[in-house]
Amino acid sequence: MKLITILFLCSRLLLSLTQESQSEEIDCNDKDLFKAVDAALKKYNSQNQSNNQFVLYRITEATKTVGSDTFYSFKYEIKEGDCPVQSGKTWQDCEYKDAAKAATGECTATVGKRSSTKFSVATQTCQITPAEGPVVTAQYDCLGCVHPISTQSPDLEPILRHGIQYFNNNTQHSSLFMLNEVKRAQRQVVAGLNFRITYSIVQTNCSKENFLFLTPDCKSLWNGDTGECTDNAYIDIQLRIASFSQNCDIYPGKDFVQPPTKICVGCPRDIPTNSPELEETLTHTITKLNAENNATFYFKIDNVKKARVQVVAGKKYFIDFVARETTCSKESNEELTESCETKKLGQSLDCNAEVYVVPWEKKIYPTVNCQPLGMISLMKRPPGFSPFRSSRIGEIKEETTVSPPHTSMAPAQDEERDSGKEQGHTRRHDWGHEKQRKHNLGHGHKHERDQGHGHQRGHGLGHGHEQQHGLGHGHKFKLDDDLEHQGGHVLDHGHKHKHGHGHGKHKNKGKKNGKHNGWKTEHLASSSEDSTTPSAQTQEKTEGPTPIPSLAKPGVTVTFSDFQDSDLIATMMPPISPAPIQSDDDWIPDIQIDPNGLSFNPISDFPDTTSPKCPGRPWKSVSEINPTTQMKESYYFDLTDGLS
């Protein structure tokens, strides 16, 4: 029975030792965190007995540790306020001092929460950047007057050293004190020099019983007593301290709690990736990897990404590393040596290993798992093809053929517009089958009658699609009710731009015409049978380039609701003359653009609106900015600007 009781007590003790405090990042605007910062800032201001109070600017980092007690570890920025310490006001009642005259700082603190309203400062360190302060000049007009000097002046060192020694020898305090910060210094030229120096001191861990004077082993105590001293010293012409007086005020340290300690027996802990204890472990790991790998060449550890160790019945290492293929083959080398260099274009492996080490048996048991990262290779690009362009070869169906290299590609308008936005209605008659038909030869005639009110009539071949021609004869006739033949450009929402001269015009249908749906363009092609139509080709060669049509047709009103971005782009595009039959880039195939590729994926102008937890909101604005006066004039581009 006693044995069972002892085992139960031991298990409970081990369980209590293995409990680890849970730490988590919290919002910098948390209410309890603000109370902890308030306690830390009041603690700091209470130790400053002569200057102005510091006011919170904002909290930059915050972590909450929950265990037997709750602790807040945080960083916060402060600015000097306009309230003196002796004013009796809290820092919340103070305003920021002028930026040119105010000191700033950053503090790191750990505060324990004892109850819902009680917060105790465990540790705190503040780095204060003083303001410019009074101007220090090399010469004054007033001879013999008291003038401020820099607190970093080397002339102050012997006086400060003497002052600290004088304080430690003439006080009843059990510990030695050391210099903390020089706050102000003044000097007066007489028959020698008069100095008046104000500085702060702090208690150290060196007691007077064990140390007669300060040594490098003496360190300041955060929970120790602090003080502020003002020394008056006279240095004669022999640079000796002829007279010295000192006035010091001591402020006892209070309300100190020890920071939380984390005890986790057997928990994994991180170790440096270049730790010497990993050398033997990594050697056995790469040996195990090469023994299990069937590759022709040896692999070598390129870099260690992360390493952890856990104390068990021995030690267990968890290592993440990258292995690279070397130039040493397994056939010509019995083992991996230091002279084996990694291949520049070799294969890489992303590996994680668990290595169990039993020191008293001098045994190591490694287990390695690797995933290939791929092989580095060089790819040839066609000349002029941008490396940043994302593309893929279009899928070739039975009904389509690859376009010849000399065929140029012209953009096509989208014919599937919303008919509700037009002034009139659009009628379309189609004959054919369900699939789109593509012809290498044939005569496709498109007849359109503009009635002046947006009524449009189109005849084509194919079910829902216009007939596509390679190098056939494409005749387009444009007839007005007034029988007036105009080479114009009708801007009507829902139909394509028509370029015409007089009664009709033979156009090269070998240019890729497609239906523009989103960003997808269907490529059509010509057949080798186009040699059977010499008359059409001869007529096309003798015809001059098509002139750029005017933007607006006389007598036709253009409404902005019918105006599209593509209308402006297509209108301003110059005519594309037929490319030469033979070209140096004939071997470059037509590449279908990936609509989801990088070149067509617009990058967002603004980041995501998810607001981070830290840093928090400023306590008070340093300077109020009027958004109505600070906003710059923005220029909004309207497509109507293209009409002017």
From Swiss-Prot:
sequence repeat boundaries on the chain: 420-449, 450-479, 480-510
Compositionally biased spans, kind Basic and acidic residues: 418-434, 477-493
Q: In which tissues is it expressed?
A: Secreted in plasma. T-kinin is detected in malignant ovarian, colon and breast carcinomas, but not in benign tumors.
Q: Where are the annotated segments for Disordered?
A: 387-555
Signal sequence, renumbered to the chain = 1-18
Region span, O-glycosylated at one site only: 120-153
Q: Name one GO cellular component term.
A: endoplasmic reticulum lumen
Stretches with biased composition (Polar residues):
524-539
Quaternary structure, per UniProt, is: Interacts (high molecular weight kininogen) (via amino acids 402-532) with triafestin-1 and triafestin-2, anticoagulant proteins from Triatoma infestans. Interacts (high molecular weight kininogen) (via amino acids 402-532) with short form salivary protein D7R1, an anticoagulant protein from Anopheles stephensi. Interacts (high molecular weight kininogen) (via amino acids 421-466 and 459-513) with haemaphysalin, an anticoagulant protein from Haemaphysalis longicornis.
- Provide the disease association from the record: High molecular weight kininogen deficiency: Autosomal recessive coagulation defect. Patients with HWMK deficiency do not have a hemorrhagic tendency, but they exhibit abnormal surface-mediated activation of fibrinolysis.
Q: What is this protein called?
A: Kininogen-1
| Gene this chain is encoded by | KNG1
